A protein has these predicted regions:
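Short hinge/loop at the helix->beta-strand junction immediately C-terminal to the helix-turn-helix recognition helix
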Residues: 29-30, 59, 64-65
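A short alpha-helical element within helix-turn-helix/winged-helix DNA-binding domains
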Residues: 35-46, 60
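Short, Lys/Arg-rich nucleic-acid/phosphate-binding segment
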Residues: 36, 68-72
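Short secondary-structure boundary/capping segments
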Residues: 5, 65-66
Length: 72
């Protein structure tokens, strides 16, 4: 999974993450049975706030692209 953040883009970072993950899910690049990285792990890798990552994940779930399974 590759996610690139463009700090010069006018789009908020959470939206960039959301859009890229959504595209990868739709195209099949990211298999539907594959777990996303943890919120903390992705935030650390991208050097962004956990809150920003959580917002992107929340948007994916709200639009039906992901489901949260607690405790995994």
């Amino acid at each position: 999974m590759n996610i690139f953040i463009d700090n010069k883009s006018g789009a908020p970072i959470y939206e960039q993450i959301f859009t890229q993950l959504k595209s990868q899910i739709i195209s099949g690049t990211l298999p539907s049975d594959e777990a996303l990285p943890s919120i903390r792990s992705l935030a650390k890798d991208l050097r962004i706030s956990v809150v920003t990552t959580k917002r992107a994940y929340d948007e994916l779930e709200k639009e039906g692209f992901t489901v949260t399974i607690h405790g995994k």
